[in-house]
């Protein structure tokens, strides 16, 4: 950790406790700042708040008094708190510096940063890069929006490590000097407009990731969205990825992933399914190569990495049948991606909480569905949907029952896909619980030797 002195004796107001606010406050205190933590909820019984007070940090909960701005503090804001909160609006009017916690991770760390952002795929890309580091002699640690507070992890790495950080648009709005050595933008679509108000605002937040990069840094982005990158403000060396054509970067040709004419791996050897995941894989492989990770380590990762839990997660093979857990697919769009990810016949496990949705928009994506197993409140809707398309449909009481019932009708090379297109709350407390029940049922049906 660098002995950063830029905040020594400075007044700093941390707005929003949570995990990131707690770690930021502890770090700021260690750096010699005069720290106050503020949160809109009552913190009188909060364990983190009590711990901070025991360290001599002032904590104010239950309201956001405007008097907190009287000392003209630097503000470290929880990224989830919108700029429309009166305290933040007043800080903007006063011209106060407003940062997010990831800025602190950059200020104190000598480790080169791989920053990953984008509307879709950033968690998969970040996790896959992390897996490649684990299989390599080069060391890297995950941080950021993926669940590991960046300012805490930054204290644990050295100049010989990489800090692999998932970055949301909310976090990127609050950076000043933050500079990743390798920046990745997976894609940019319309999202979070309730927070950003306009698509331009959202896109500009994402572009913050490369604003401080120099010619010694790298930007990796989707070739087919290159028009969104503002070349006049870009100084980093730019590499592209594409699944459709040869580009200056990494691409797919003759079903191989290719970098600078070198074939790395065939598509059929990848564990992660789907065209969208192929784009994620290209971005991760390119970042790994630029970080000095060996091709062997990259291949080891690509042939074993099963994905993020409950997100089109490969959980194993029984005889010739691969099973995929996509329990996080709680809406039709996510299930469309899942159904489009396979060329093999699919046994599709579907259903859950009835929110009044119409599932007809799934019809164009059902061509590879051989059989459906419907359960939950939406069972009857999925029966009707399947029968309208001439699909074989059976019903089950729940996910576990569905896995049991398909054992007598499954055919060689069928893919078994849990992608409910519905929330889980009619039968399970969370989508994680539903996914874990699916995994246990798969394991229970494995042959014993």
Curated annotation (Swiss-Prot):
Q: Which UniProt keywords apply?
A: ATP-binding, Cell cycle, Cell division, Cell shape, Cell wall biogenesis/degradation, Cytoplasm, Ligase, Nucleotide-binding, Peptidoglycan synthesis
Task: Please tell me whether the keyword Cell wall biogenesis/degradation is annotated for this protein.
Answer: yes
Q: What is its main location?
A: cytoplasm
Catalytic activity annotation: UDP-N-acetyl-alpha-D-muramoyl-L-alanine + D-glutamate + ATP = UDP-N-acetyl-alpha-D-muramoyl-L-alanyl-D-glutamate + ADP + phosphate + H(+)
Matches recorded under SUPFAM superfamilies: MurCD N-terminal domain, MurD-like peptide ligases, catalytic domain, MurD-like peptide ligases, peptide-binding domain
State which Enzyme Commission number(s) the record gives.
6.3.2.9
Residues reported to bind ATP:
118-124
Q: Which GO terms describe its biological process?
A: cell division; cell wall organization; peptidoglycan biosynthetic process; regulation of cell shape
Protein purpose = Cell wall formation. Catalyzes the addition of glutamate to the nucleotide precursor UDP-N-acetylmuramoyl-L-alanine (UMA).
Q: Which PANTHER family match?
A: UDP-N-ACETYLMURAMOYLALANINE--D-GLUTAMATE LIGASE (PTHR43692:SF1)
Give the family this protein belongs to, as stated in its UniProt record: Belongs to the MurCDEF family.
Q: What name has this protein been given in UniProt?
A: UDP-N-acetylmuramoylalanine--D-glutamate ligase
